[in-house]
């Protein structure tokens, strides 16, 4: 979530983040979300309201621009844990949302997904099957995350011509260190690994990265851009 922090969105796991104000087991728990139906939807209605007020920041714009400018030379894949749409609004296209999208609703019964945008959910039933318990299209705790399969497949196919850029993560949910260590233990050589966080995280093994920039994402852009262009000789 650190990627979107500079846009003004609250993160979940920082000391003053959303989980310091709300119990995640009340608003992000697959085992009891129907029981807490009203509270859950109130929480995500508020998140959409906040999302409507912010704009992509410099790093969103840089990543989207890099994707556009290197099209045909570099395949850029944005694997994001963020549930906002700021990468999309910046113009990025090849995006995989590992934990769902705040601007969508899903029917657990029939699987129908509808775009709600930034408006509040009015508790209307599923327009396809009539189910009255429509859920935010967010991966809750204790819920399967189907996009993780793509994450592991992509990392399993990396080669020495590829680069991994990690921006704004604590490493506590998707343990990027474990993923990198796992694939490298199987003989996969990743050409360049860059980490950009505000500060070190006990869940991230710095020794796995070639370049580390502890700074705001927007401030790290010049260094990241230099490393990427040198690596791919752009």
Model regions and ranges:
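Conserved catalytic core of sirtuin-type NAD+-dependent deacylases
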Residues: 1-234
């Amino acid at each position: 979530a650190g990627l979107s922090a500079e846009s003004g969105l609250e993160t979940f796991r920082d000391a003053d983040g959303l989980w310091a104000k709300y119990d995640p087991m009340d608003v992000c728990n697959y085992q009891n979300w129907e029981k807490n139906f009203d509270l859950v939807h109130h929480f995500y209605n508020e998140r959409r309201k906040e999302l409507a007020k912010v704009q992509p920041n410099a790093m969103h714009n840089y990543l989207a621009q890099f994707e556009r400018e290197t099209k045909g030379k570099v395949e850029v894949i944005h694997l994001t844990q963020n549930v906002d749409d700021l990468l999309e609004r910046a113009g990025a296209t090849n995006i995989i949302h590992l934990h769902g999208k705040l601007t969508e609703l899903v029917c657990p019964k029939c699987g129908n997904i509808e775009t709600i945008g930034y408006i509040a959910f009015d508790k209307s039933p599923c327009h396809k099957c009539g189910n009255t318990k429509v859920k935010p299209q967010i991966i809750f705790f204790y819920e399967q995350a189907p996009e993780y399969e793509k994450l592991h497949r992509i990392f399993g196919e990396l080669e020495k011509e590829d680069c991994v850029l990690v921006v704004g993560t604590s490493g506590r949910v998707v343990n990027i260190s474990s993923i990198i260590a796992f694939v490298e233990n199987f003989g996969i050589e990743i050409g360049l690994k860059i980490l950009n966080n505000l500060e070190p995280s006990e869940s991230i093994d710095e020794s796995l990265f070639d370049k580390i920039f502890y700074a705001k994402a927007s401030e790290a852009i010049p260094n990241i851009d230099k490393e990427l262009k040198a690596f791919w000789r752009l």
